[in-house]
Regions:
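Charged catalytic carboxylate motif
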Residues: 36, 139, 165
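Conserved GNAT acetyl-CoA-binding A-motif
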Residues: 149-158
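GNAT-family acyltransferases
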Residues: 9-121, 186-196
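Conserved catalytic-core motifs of GNAT/GCN5-like acyltransferases
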Residues: 158-159, 174-191
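Short coil/turn motifs at secondary-structure junctions
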Residues: 110-112, 129, 162
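Conserved beta-strand-loop-alpha-helix junction that forms the acyl-donor binding cleft
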Residues: 157-165
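Conserved acetyl-CoA-binding loop-helix of GNAT-fold acetyltransferases
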Residues: 123-126, 132-145, 168-172
Length: 196
């Protein structure tokens, strides 16, 4: 089964990909799927607090998702860009077969010094109960299409060295390891480049 379709969702063109029987897309949440988004974020936040896991992408955890309208307004950084920020687009990965959100990406439109060092163009993450099912690889593939639409020709993705699953997902999308650096938290981080 191989389906690829293109559709408009809240002004963001998003590809729908079936990969290993996955029917997923990167979308902007709306009132129609508010409950599914809150359920995912509640589960994810509980995992972060209980297991002290890395909150990635961090942007989706900066605001109270129960204040839904304000939450959606805060997700993206738009022009004019505040000092110390770059424009970003945050999209959530929706599985249409399961009717749930499974992850999120935060796409930085260009890199500043800090992002070039250890942040990259794409921050991504998969909700705890849906990890190790292939979603990350498929979601990154969709995020790379969004990067291409923004005119980005070479994408930097970074992950902590101990995050083997994330590294595999990046490599599965053509990531080539350039080097390892210490991030802002002094954690060893791998820097991968993907040519589009």
């Amino acid at each position: 089964m191989k389906k690829i379709g293109i559709g408009m969702l809240k002004g963001i063109e998003s590809s729908i990909v079936s990969r290993n029987y996955m029917n997923i897309a990167l979308i902007k949440p709306s009132e129609d799927n508010k409950e599914q988004l809150i359920e995912m974020l509640d589960e994810w936040k509980h995992d972060i607090e209980t297991n002290h896991t890395n909150p990635s992408p961090r942007r989706i955890f900066r605001y109270d998702h129960h204040d839904f309208t304000n939450y959606l307004e805060q997700l993206d950084v738009k022009e004019p860009v505040p000092a110390g920020r770059v424009p970003t687009t945050t999209l959530f990965c929706y599985d249409y077969d399961k009717n749930i959100f499974v992850g999120a990406v935060n796409i930085r439109h260009y890199l500043d010094e800090g992002l070039l060092h250890s942040g990259g163009h794409i921050g991504d993450g998969i909700r705890p109960n849906e990890r190790r099912k292939g979603y990350a690889t498929a979601m990154i593939a969709l995020a790379l299409k969004e990067c291409k639409k923004l005119g980005i020709e070479r994408v930097l993705m970074c992950c902590r060295k101990d995050n083997i699953g994330s590294a595999k997902s990046i490599i599965n999308n053509g990531g080539v390891l350039e080097n390892e650096v210490l991030d802002e938290d002094d954690v060893l981080t791998q820097r991968y480049w993907i040519d589009l």
